[in-house]
A protein has these predicted regions:
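Conserved active-site alpha-helix within GNAT-family acetyltransferase domains
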Residues: 98-99, 114, 119-137
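Conserved GNAT-fold acetyl-CoA-binding loop/helix
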Residues: 19-42
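Conserved acetyl-CoA-binding loop of GNAT-fold acetyltransferases
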Residues: 5, 105, 109, 129-138
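A short helix-loop-beta-strand connector motif used in the catalytic cores of GNAT acetyltransferases and
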Residues: 42-54
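Conserved acetyl-CoA pyrophosphate-binding loop and the N-cap/start of the following alpha-helix
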Residues: 91-103
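Conserved beta-strand in the GNAT
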Residues: 54, 60-69
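A short beta-loop-alpha structural element at the N-terminal edge
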Residues: 2-16
Length: 144
């Protein structure tokens, strides 16, 4: 499995995976075609805010991830939010998510890493905890 930066040629495959991810129980909102495209295009631009990654093998794309950059005043250092982490159903359980978490932990070893998970997504939470993430007791709020 190879992890690489998302490219323009990946947009169609990534947007298709986003449709599946956002239609699943892993997220609260369903997103929209407009949002999926904006997110994917932001990943392949020179954006200082969002990075996109693709996981692939000789058969093709296995999944994707998107990471947003910010600063954590709580911890006094840069913060990487793992916004999306999606592995196609047929490739789950092969360590791809764990490999990505190890990759991003190494790349941003001087940063706080954060992510969100639905409480019901026990399989993902197990992977995150195994990678060293801890559950925070916060209630998250949003204003759109």
């Amino acid at each position: 499995m190879k992890i690489r930066i998302m490219e323009n040629a990946d947009l169609s495959a990534v947007i298709n995976m986003m449709r599946g991810f956002y239609a699943s129980d892993a997220v609260l909102t369903n997103g929209s075609e407009e949002i999926f495209r904006a997110d994917a295009v932001e990943c392949v631009s020179d954006s200082p805010y969002l990075e996109g990654y693709v996981f692939e093998n000789e058969s093709g794309v296995q999944g994707y991830a998107m990471c947003a950059k910010s600063f954590s005043t709580e911890f006094g250092k840069r913060c990487i939010w793992i916004e999306d982490l999606f592995v196609k159903e047929e490739y789950r359980g092969q360590g791809i998510g764990s490999d990505f978490l190890a990759f991003i932990s190494g790349k941003y070893s001087d940063c706080v890493l954060r992510l969100e998970a639905e409480a019901e997504n026990e399989r993902a939470i197990h992977v995150y905890k195994k990678a060293g993430f801890e559950v925070l007791p916060y209630t998250e709020l949003i204003k759109l």
